[in-house]
Amino acid sequence: MFRLKSVCVSRNVNAFYRSFASRNNVLFVLGAPGSGKGKHSDHLVAKFGGCHVSVGEILRETVKTPGKYTEMIQKHMNEGTLVPTEVTMELIRDKVMNSTNGVLLLDGYPRNMSNYKTWCDVMGDSCNVLGCLLYKCSYEFLEKRLIARGKDSGRADDNLEVIKRRFYSYEHETKEVLDKLREKYSIEEICTEPPFEEAFPNSVKAYCKIIKQNGLM
């Protein structure tokens, strides 16, 4: 499977890419678990350059090595609940601040109002939020996709009990932050129930629309 995680692709092909050289332009990428945020983000970065920082991947990588947050993060992952905001921000802050080449796709953040308020406090002066890509599928469709993924990946958070808790958390915590984001930013919705080859062109259109709205293309 084609995957790029928390990686920057440097492209100085034209003025579009050079215009980002010293700026932190961030595009939030949200959606329920299994909605395709990561795969679409990887392919957008491959097409347009920039960076993809996946909060979920950072957390999964963090628990592989013993450290001060390992047990706590693993517990939240096993239970399908959100890691405390201050921990998540500590883990992603440097990656976001050091990613100044192109648009940074921040995958899986902010997930709740605590995330968003902390973002505004810590990153608000140094990052320019362009908008949000919102990936959408029915929960029934996502449940089947995640169960199938769990058989291949062995991920602890891809079993039915945890999946349902993750959906509940997304439905009850992320809706509020999406309403808040809509007050300030453009949110482009992409349905990812069709096969990737059919859905990805809509990702490209949504991405380009937000970039153009910000005068960057």
Predicted features, each with a name:
Residues 1-217:
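Glycine-rich phosphate-binding loop of ATP-dependent small-molecule kinases
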